[in-house]
C-alpha cells in the first residue's frame, strides 16, 4: 500500500474527536515492555494480562469487545461511553494513530497509509477541530519512551537472529551440507504470531513475552536492558549444552523463530 510521508512541521487534523472509531477493528502489536506497562495499569501480572487481553501468544491485543455500527469489534480494553480503560499506558500504535512510524537507515519517519488522511473515514468531524503539527502531536501523545522501546526491541530481535546465524556459520553446520536450517527459516518468516507461538516452547515464549522483571514506567531503558541480558544468558546456556549437528540445527531454528516472533 502507498504511504504518505510527513514532516514534523506539517499541520494535520490530529485533534481526536473521541468517537472511538480507531478502537474498533484494528490490529495493535505489543512489545514486552508495552505489555508489562498495560498489565501494571490493570494491576495484574503480565502473564494474567497476556491471557485476558492478548492473542498470538501475547504479541497482539485482542479485539473481542462489542461491535460498532460498522460491525467491527472493539479492543478488549475499550469501554463504551468512556474510551480506553488503560489510556495512560496505551501502546505506541495507539499513541501514534492515525500515524505510523518507520525506521530506515537509523532515521525515523512518520507516515500515514494511503494518500487520504485516515481519520476522514469514520471521523470526518475532525475537520472541524484544530489542526496540530506532527511534532506537537507526538509530544502530546508522549511517544518518546515508547519509540525507544520499539527501537530497542528491534535490536533485541536482531541479537537473537545473530545467534541463529552464529549457530549456522560457526559450528560447522553450514559446512556439513545442511540445507534444512535455511528452509525452516524461510518457512518461519511466513508464519503469523499465532503459528509461531505454537512452535515455540513455553519457557521461551514466557522468557520473550512476559519476563519476570519489575517495571518502572519512567525507566524503560532498565527494563529492556535487563530483558536483553536475560535472553542472552538463557540463549548462551542453551547453546552451551549442544553437541550434535541436529542440536545446532534445532537451536538455530529456535533462535530465528524467536527473532521473527
Residue ranges and their predicted role:
Residues 1-21, 28-36, 40-261:
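Short loop/turn segments that flank or connect secondary-structure elements
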Amino acid at each position: 500500500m502507498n504511504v504518505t510521508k510527513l514532516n514534523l512541521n506539517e499541520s494535520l487534523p490530529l485533534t481526536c474527536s473521541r468517537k472511538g472509531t480507531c478502537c474498533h477493528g484494528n490490529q495493535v502489536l505489543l512489545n514486552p515492555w508495552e505489555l508489562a506497562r498495560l498489565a501494571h495499569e490493570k494491576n495484574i501480572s503480565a502473564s494474567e494480562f497476556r491471557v485476558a487481553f492478548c492473542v498470538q501468544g501475547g504479541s497482539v491485543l485482542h479485539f473481542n469487545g462489542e461491535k460498532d455500527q460498522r460491525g467491527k469489534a472493539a479492543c478488549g480494553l475499550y469501554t463504551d461511553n468512556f474510551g480506553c480503560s488503560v489510556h495512560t499506558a496505551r501502546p505506541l500504535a495507539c499513541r501514534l494513530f492515525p500515524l505510523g512510524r518507520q525506521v530506515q537507515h537509523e532515521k525515523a519517519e512518520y507516515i500515514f497509509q494511503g494518500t487520504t488522511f485516515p481519520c476522514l473515514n469514520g471521523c470526518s468531524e475532525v475537520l472541524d477541530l484544530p489542526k496540530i503539527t506532527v511534532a506537537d502531536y507526538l509530544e502530546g501523545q508522549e511517544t518518546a519512551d515508547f519509540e525507544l522501546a520499539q527501537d530497542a526491541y528491534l535490536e533485541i530481535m536482531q541479537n537473537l537472529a545473530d545467534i541463529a546465524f552464529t549457530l549456522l556459520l560457526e559450528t560447522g553446520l553450514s559446512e556439513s551440507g545442511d540445507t534444512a536450517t535455511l528452509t525452516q527459516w524461510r518457512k518461519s518468516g511466513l508464519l503469523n504470531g499465532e503459528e509461531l507461538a505454537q512452535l515455540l516452547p513455553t519457557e521461551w515464549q514466557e522468557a520473550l513475552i512476559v519476563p519476570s522483571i519489575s517495571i518502572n514506567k519512567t525507566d524503560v531503558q532498565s527494563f529492556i536492558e535487563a530483558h536483553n541480558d536475560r535472553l542472552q544468558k538463557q540463549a548462551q546456556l542453551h547453546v552451551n549444552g549442544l553437541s550434535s549437528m541436529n542440536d545446532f540445527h534445532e537451536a538455530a531454528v529456535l533462535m530465528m523463530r524467536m527473532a521473527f516472533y
